[in-house]
Curated annotation (Swiss-Prot):
Protein name: Homogentisate 1,2-dioxygenase
Protein's GO biological process: L-phenylalanine catabolic process; tyrosine catabolic process
Free-text function comment from the UniProt entry: Involved in the catabolism of homogentisate (2,5-dihydroxyphenylacetate or 2,5-OH-PhAc), a central intermediate in the degradation of phenylalanine and tyrosine. Catalyzes the oxidative ring cleavage of the aromatic ring of homogentisate to yield maleylacetoacetate.
CDD domains according to UniProt: cupin_HGO_N
Matches recorded under InterPro entries: HgmA_C, HgmA_N, Homogentis_dOase, Homogentis_dOase_bac, RmlC-like_jellyroll, RmlC_Cupin_sf
NCBIfam families: hmgA
Species for this entry: Pseudomonas entomophila (strain L48)
GO cellular component terms, semicolon-separated: cytoplasm
Active site (record annotation): H288 (proton acceptor)
Annotated residues for binding of Fe cation: H331, E337, H367
Family: Belongs to the homogentisate dioxygenase family.
Cofactor entry: Fe cation
Pathway this chain belongs to: Amino-acid degradation; L-phenylalanine degradation; acetoacetate and fumarate from L-phenylalanine: step 4/6
Reactions listed under catalytic activity: homogentisate + O2 = 4-maleylacetoacetate + H(+)
Length: 433
C-alpha cells in the first residue's frame, strides 16, 4: 500500500494533460492566450519545451501570466565558482561500480553539489543524457534554471521542497521529480542534508511508455503523476538567478523573485511521481521477462522502440516463476546501463551495491548476478516469495555512456568490482544432463 498525498500541498493529477491553474480568481484570460491587457496587470509569456510544429500529442508548451516578464534581467556573467566539470575521462570498456558519495563538509546548496558521473552527449546537442549525483546540506537562496536539458531528480536521502515557476512540489526518497528544460526553480531542504541522482535529459521530453499488449492499465498510471498548482512570490530585493548553459554556470541579479507566475495553462510542466504506486508487471508462469516491463518514463529517439533514455525501476514484487533462474539473467546489452539504489538491496547483487552507490555497464559489457546470488538461485527450493523493502533503478540509454574524469578518480570507485563474478564455477558435465 502507498501513503496518501501530503495534505499541505495541492496538486493536479495526470500525465500529458493540458492543465490550467490560477492563484488569484480570474487571473487566466478566457478564450485567448495573449490579450491586450492581461488580468491583474500581468504579463503573458510562452515557455516552449518543444518546437512549434511538433505533433499535438508530443507538443509541450505553457502560457505563464506573471508579475514581471522573464526578459527583465541584466546581462548574465560567468560565475567564478563553477560546477565540477563534466569533462569525460579516459575511455574504458570495464564494468564500474561506486560506493556512496560522502556528504559535503562545506555548506553546499543543491546546484553546488552536483558530481558528474557519466555522459554521452555534449550539452549543445538535442540528444543524449548526462548523469550526476547531487549532495546538499543547505537550502538554496537563489533561483536556478537549466538551459541544457530536462532534469529527472531521484532522491536517495533527504526530502526536498522544490519551488518552481508553476508552483511547489515536495518530494522524498521513493518519489521522483521532473523539471522541464528552462523552468526556474529553487530547492529547499526539509532535512539536514540530501543526496540523490540526476538524469539530465538533452533529448525528447520524458513521457510514459506505450503499454502494447499489457493493455490500457499498468506500470506508471497517468493519474498518479502530480503537477503543482499556481503559487507566486511577490518580493523586492536582490535575488540571484543562475542558469546552466553548455555546462557552465552564469548568473545575474534581479530585484524581484522570478517565481512570480500568478496563473498558467499548458502541458510543459514540472511533476512528481511516487514510485510506490508503480503497478509492477511480471511472469506468473516461467522465465524472467525483459526489464523493459519496469519502465517508468522514456525519452524516445527517431528509431521506433529505441530510447534516448529510459528510467526503469526494480520495486518490491512477488517472484513466482516455476523451474526458473529467478534473478536478472546474465546479459550483454546493446544499451548502456547506469544503476543506482534508493533503499534496500538489489536482487542481482548480494554485496557491494549500496544505497547512494552506482554502477555502469556499457554497451556489450557482460554482467549479471554475482557468484553468491547465482549459487543461491540455482540451488534454492522454489516457492513464491516477495522481494521487499527495495528500490533499485536504472537510467538506460542507446548512446555509449562515458564516465567523467571525477568519477574515474573518485575514492568511491570500487577497484575490485570484477571480483564479484570471479568465483563463478564451471558446473558443466557432458555426462550428466
Amino acid at each position: 500500500m502507498t501513503r496518501d498525498t501530503s495534505p499541505q500541498l495541492q496538486y493536479l493529477s495526470g500525465f500529458g494533460n493540458e492543465f490550467a491553474s490560477e492563484a488569484l480568481p480570474g487571473a487566466l484570460p478566457v478564450g485567448q492566450n495573449s490579450p491586450q491587457k492581461a488580468p491583474y496587470g500581468l504579463y503573458a509569456e510562452l515557455l516552449s519545451g518543444t518546437a512549434f510544429t511538433m505533433t499535438r500529442s508530443e507538443l509541450r508548451r505553457t502560457w505563464l501570466y506573471r508579475i514581471r516578464p522573464s526578459a527583465l534581467h541584466p546581462r548574465f556573467e560567468r560565475l567564478e565558482r563553477q560546477p565540477l566539470t563534466g569533462a569525460l575521462g579516459a575511455i574504458t570498456p570495464n564494468r564500474l561500480r561506486w560506493s556512496p558519495q560522502p556528504m559535503p563538509a562545506e555548506p553546499t546548496d543543491f546546484i553546488e553539489g552536483w558530481l558528474p558521473m557519466v555522459a554521452n552527449s555534449a550539452s549543445e546537442k538535442p540528444a543524449g543524457v548526462s548523469i550526476y549525483i547531487y549532495r546538499a546540506n543547505r537550502s538554496m537562496e537563489r533561483v536556478f534554471f537549466n538551459a541544457d536539458g530536462e532534469l529527472l531528480l531521484v532522491p536517495e536521502q533527504g526530502r526536498l521542497r522544490i519551488a518552481t515557476e508553476l508552483g511547489v512540489l515536495e518530494v522524498e526518497p521513493l518519489e521522483i521529480a521532473v523539471i522541464p528544460r528552462g523552468m526556474k526553480f529553487r530547492v529547499e531542504l526539509l532535512d539536514d542534508q540530501a543526496r540523490g541522482y540526476i538524469a539530465e535529459n538533452h533529448g525528447a521530453p520524458l513521457r510514459i511508455p506505450d503499454l502494447g499488449p499489457i493493455g490500457s492499465n499498468g506500470l506508471a498510471n497517468p493519474r498518479d503523476f502530480l503537477t503543482p498548482v499556481a503559487h507566486y512570490e511577490e518580493t523586492s530585493g536582490p535575488v540571484q538567478l543562475v542558469q546552466k548553459f553548455l555546462g557552465e554556470h552564469w548568473a545575474c541579479e534581479l530585484q524581484h523573485s522570478p517565481l512570480d507566475v500568478v496563473a498558467w495553462h499548458g502541458s510543459n510542466v514540472p511533476y512528481k511521481y511516487d514510485l510506490r504506486r508503480f503497478n509492477t508487471i511480471g511472469t506468473v508462469s516461467f522465465d524472467h521477462p525483459d526489464p523493459s516491463i519496469f519502465t517508468v518514463l522514456t525519452s524516445p529517439t527517431s528509431v521506433h522502440g529505441m530510447a534516448n533514455m529510459d528510467f526503469v525501476i526494480f520495486p518490491p514484487r512477488w517472484m513466482v516463476a516455476e523451474n526458473t533462474f529467478r534473478p536478472p539473467w546474465f546479459h550483454r546489452n546493446l544499451m548502456n546501463e547506469f544503476m543506482g539504489l534508493i533503499q534496500g538491496a538489489y536482487d542481482a547483487k548480494a554485496e557491494g551495491f549500496l544505497p547512494g552507490g552506482a554502477s555502469l555497464h556499457g554497451v556489450m559489457s557482460a554482467h549479471g548476478p554475482d557468484a553468491e546470488t547465482c549459487d543461491k538461485a540455482i540451488s534454492v527450493d522454489l516457492a513464491p516469495h516477495k522481494i521487499d523493502n527495495t528500490m533499485a533503478f536504472m537510467f538506460e540509454t542507446s548512446q555509449v555512456l562515458r564516465p567523467s574524469r571525477q568519477a574515474l578518480e573518485s575514492p568511491q570507485l570500487q577497484a575490485d568490482y570484477d571480483s564479484c563474478w570471479a568465483t563463478l564455477p564451471s558446473t558443466f558435465n557432458p555426462n550428466r544432463r
